[in-house]
Swiss-Prot record:
Belongs to the PsaJ family. The chain crosses the membrane at residues 7-27. May help in the organization of the PsaE and PsaF subunits. It comes from Vitis vinifera. This is Photosystem I reaction center subunit IX. GO terms for biological process: photosynthesis. It is a single-pass membrane protein.
């Protein structure tokens, strides 16, 4: 039962950190490359 409580207390924390860092990464990519649908340097 203690392991279950440990899992339930760490999984939300880890997922919050993961999704927060992923959102920050996407925000910074969109800040550096504003229109990600067209990359002019690939043409």
């Amino acid at each position: 039962m203690r392991d279950l409580k440990t899992y339930l207390s760490t999984a939300p924390v880890l997922s919050t950190i993961w999704f927060g860092s992923l959102a920050g990464l996407l925000i910074e990519i969109n800040r550096l490359f504003p229109d990600a649908l067209t990359f002019p340097f690939f043409n």
